A protein has these predicted regions:
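Flavin-dependent oxidoreductase catalytic cores
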Residues: 1-203
């Protein structure tokens, strides 16, 4: 692309408040593994959205400082606010990862992934499978919020596993009770993957 688009002015769209972070315009590039890397975020930034979330970063290898994960978690010098999506199935590692990211001043916003429908993630009990276990979901969210301090934490989740196991209302309530700054609903089930229509009435 060869043009810059000016962000919307304050009078055009009301900003989105995520704790102390003000997103203006209130347009968010959703995180997606293998897609929302730095070059892609840089291209999208030219079109004027307010928040660009990184691709999914796994908590444990981040805590263990594995090179590949550290590179994925890097931001460009021109990126502000720095928004990272974190994935984990163990509250301990999630808490440690958040504490490290915040303590090292690496992020301005953390989004927790509870919506990934990919089988290699869900068969390990992660992503969209976590809200099926509300106590685990609560403990992971609590660990993230506790260690984030003033950095806003949001959560992203789906309607549920399939039409017979819908978990989104409970997931949203747990997020609210544990102090997240916002919740994001992908209004499809994990079984739908990225096919079919979103159920806007659920949103």
């Amino acid at each position: 692309h060869n043009r810059e688009v000016a962000p919307a002015g304050p009078g055009e769209l009301a900003p989105l408040s995520l704790g102390p972070l003000e997103v203006c315009p209130p347009v968010v590039l959703a995180p997606m593994a293998g897609v929302t890397n730095y070059p892609f975020r840089a291209i999208c930034r030219g079109f004027g959205a307010g928040l660009y979330v990184s691709e999914m970063i796994t908590a444990r290898p981040l805590v263990e400082r594995r090179d590949k994960t550290l590179k994925l978690a890097d931001f460009g010098p021109d990126e502000s606010p720095r928004s990272l999506q974190l994935y984990g199935v163990d509250p301990h590692y999630v808490g440690e990862a958040v504490a490290r990211l915040v303590g090292e001043g690496k992020v301005d916003h953390i989004d927790m992934n509870f919506g990934c429908p990919v089988r290699k993630v869900t068969r390990k009990g992660g992503g969209a499978a976590i809200p099926v276990k509300p106590n685990l979901l609560r403990n992971i969210v609590r660990a993230a919020v506790k260690n984030a301090g003033a950095v806003p934490v949001t959560i992203k989740f789906r309607l549920g596993i399939d039409d017979g196991l819908l978990t989104y209302l409970d997931a949203g309530r747990i997020g609210e009770e544990e102090g997240v700054a916002a919740v994001g609903l992908h209004a499809r089930t994990a079984a739908q993957l990225y096919d079919g229509e979103s159920r806007w009435d659920a949103i």
